[in-house]
């Protein structure tokens, strides 16, 4: 128990990088969290309601955050291709530049990167297990990476198709939204995520897809 408590205390200290008073580089912590999430989220999750759920805010608060980010030219709204009544939030090039240069968690990312690949993988997997226990205990679901989701499936002949530019493509399908998912999108966050119990099989498909996409 003392070891577990020490580990939790260290996590709390690390969290200070993204929870803070006032603002940093013109944005408050929740505004940074929103910009960061929208930059990493897939097209199904870049909506005002999904954003509100992710940052733990009301829709009214999330709407105000979106307006703030829009006023700084960090976000733009575009009609959804899946549902014309909805909008999708897109991070602009200026928003990406702000994240790359000023995101308060960048120094945490650099510190984790410095651990090396093996240590980084162990840390990620340990944190994932902790979140799994928390999700089960509180009957909740957190946003996570598309590639680990039970709704991701290989789409038709997908692997090995040839695109217009002559490169091989890899296609997947989201069974929840009944929509195609590109290989690049499988690395993005989704708020409708449910973890798969068949991850090795999915990883095998994705490894083949990456090889195909590289020609």
Predicted regions and their residues:
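N-terminal leader segment of winged-helix/HTH proteins
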Residues: 1-25
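Short polar/acidic secondary-structure junctions
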Residues: 40, 80-81, 154, 179
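Pre-recognition alpha-helix immediately N-terminal to the DNA-recognition helix
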Residues: 6, 13, 33-37, 97, ...
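Mid-protein regulatory/catalytic core that forms ligand/cofactor-binding pockets
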Residues: 132-215
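N-terminal helix-turn-helix DNA-binding core of bacterial DNA-binding proteins
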Residues: 19-58
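Charged, amphipathic alpha-helical coiled-coil/dimerization segments
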Residues: 70-120
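Canonical helix-turn-helix DNA-binding module
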Residues: 43-87
